[in-house]
């Protein structure tokens, strides 16, 4: 597939040691020859072999405005599958912008967001799931999230899906031969073999789907509401998890009146923390609005850390909070473990996934909470090198495929082989959409709209 030659800055904006301007397309070498002058006059850009580098000056007309390195990649052995030249100049926005402008003046076109990776996909260098993994790596905050994305980039998901497609395709070929050519001596599939194959595929797809939520937490983080009565220790907990004094802590009840936000990395999970106003009855209109927002954050959160004062007996507000947490991903933290305990944790235990005695003023509580969060969200069970689904597009396609296979299983037990064949076709279509083999232009556009310019 022939494209124009494109140019864009591939590195993050701002000051830095180097910036990289990437050229890709059939005229990459011609454009590079107009903006890069090798330090060794005997060397010519047009003659550069793939996987080689040259030192020289970046020029605009006859004026040299910087010096750096040009890296050369010959098609198809490049990221995009096209001729690629990467020009490494000094960092900072002024020089990099001028270099891009020089490339455009020399015949290149400005790259659109995600155009390099889109070309890699269209040229068969990456599957659609691998292309999505590129964006996941760029966006990753934690080591495990980056490892999950890297596994997909290296083809773990593509291989897993290919194995299921192969099993279904072999099954479908046998079904088609038996249905379409009844006069031929094609052995009929036994129901047990048919069900075994379908059941195996369904289990593999279901395992992928079941691991999605934990994988999404590792990649994207989770919104976490810190809730509780006034002076239970919510802001102290926020400061403990943040590692600095993010919120004001005083003995005065109602100090926190609005939601205080802070993103933290807790183990392998990024938590978007929301420290909320203390929950109690009040006539103060401002505090009442803060409490309304507290309940709203609790209802919206993907994780709840409910803080209780362990030095006091449970109150009506404590029990109301516990009941609101029932059936939610919530951990009860009975705070002030360093003081005599008067709180009966058994009263709230039925409403929480786990109840932990802690002292939010002690650093050790951070590790205890991190381990509990990992257990509750299932991130401690994730194999970062295994196949995993990323994003709603992949989840939706995998779910449709799983449901179609389940339909084929039901059909195999009584509706006949024609019905089985229809369901298997639906499953294969969904799996091909997942990998991008038959994804619509709208789906492809949606994937690459997430990318930045230069990637």
Task: Give the positions of each predicted feature.
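A glycine-rich (often HGG/GG-containing) alpha/beta subdomain
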Residues: 1-147, 151, 155, 331
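C-terminal-of-GTPase-core extension/linker across diverse P-loop GTPases
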Residues: 2-9, 13, 143-265, 282-284, ...
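Switch I (G2) and immediately adjacent beta-strands of P-loop GTPase domains
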Residues: 55-65, 70-74, 254-282, 300
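Short glycine-/small-residue-rich Rossmann-like dinucleotide-binding loops
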Residues: 242, 277-278, 302, 309, ...
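Short, Asp-centered acidic motifs that coordinate Mg2+ and/or phosphate
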Residues: 271, 303, 331
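Generic enzyme active-site microenvironment
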Residues: 273, 307, 333
């Amino acid at each position: 597939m022939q494209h124009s030659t494109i140019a864009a800055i591939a590195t993050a904006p701002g000051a830095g040691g180097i910036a990289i301007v990437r050229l890709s397309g059939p005229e990459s070498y011609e454009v590079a020859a107009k903006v890069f002058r090798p330090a060794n006059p005997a060397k010519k850009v047009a003659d550069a072999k793939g996987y080689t580098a040259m030192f020289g000056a970046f020029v605009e007309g006859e004026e040299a405005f910087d010096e750096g390195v040009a890296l050369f990649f010959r098609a198809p052995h490049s990221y995009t599958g096209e001729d690629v030249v990467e020009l490494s100049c000094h960092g900072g926005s002024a020089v990099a912008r001028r270099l891009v402008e020089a490339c455009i003046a020399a015949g290149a076109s400005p790259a659109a967001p995600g155009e390099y990776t889109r070309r890699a996909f269209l040229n068969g260098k990456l599957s659609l799931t691998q292309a999505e993994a590129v964006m996941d790596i760029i966006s990753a905050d934690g080591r495990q999230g980056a490892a999950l994305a890297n596994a997909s980039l290296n083809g773990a998901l593509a291989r897993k899906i290919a194995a299921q497609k192969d099993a279904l395709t072999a099954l479908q070929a046998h079904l088609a031969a038996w249905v379409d050519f009844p006069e031929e001596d094609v052995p009929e599939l036994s129901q047990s073999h048919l069900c075994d194959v379908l059941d195996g595929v369904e289990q593999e797809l279901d395992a992928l789907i079941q691991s999605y939520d934990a994988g999404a937490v590792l990649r994207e983080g989770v919104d976490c509401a810190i809730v509780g009565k006034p002076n239970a220790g919510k802001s102290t907990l926020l400061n403990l998890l943040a590692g600095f004094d993010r919120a004001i802590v005083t003995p005065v009840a109602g100090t926190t009146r609005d939601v205080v936000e802070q993103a933290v990395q807790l183990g392998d999970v990024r938590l978007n923390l929301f420290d909320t106003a203390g929950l109690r009855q009040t006539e103060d209109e401002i505090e009442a609005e803060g409490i309304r927002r507290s309940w709203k954050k609790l209802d919206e959160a993907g994780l709840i850390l409910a803080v209780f004062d362990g030095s006091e007996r449970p109150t009506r507000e404590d029990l109301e909070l516990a009941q609101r947490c029932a059936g939610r991903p919530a951990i009860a933290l009975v705070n002030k473990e360093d003081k005599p305990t008067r709180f009966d944790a058994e009263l709230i235990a039925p409403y929480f996934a786990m109840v932990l005695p802690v002292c939010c003023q002690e650093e050790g509580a951070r590790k205890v909470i991190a381990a509990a969060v990992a257990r509750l969200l299932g991130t401690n069970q994730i194999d970062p090198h295994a196949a995993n689904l990323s994003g709603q597009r992949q989840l939706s396609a995998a779910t449709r495929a799983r449901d179609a296979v389940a339909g084929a299983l039901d059909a195999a037990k009584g509706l006949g082989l024609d019905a089985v064949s229809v369901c298997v076709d639906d499953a294969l279509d969904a799996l091909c959409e997942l990998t991008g083999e038959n994804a619509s232009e709208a789906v492809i556009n949606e994937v690459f709209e997430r990318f930045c310019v230069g990637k």
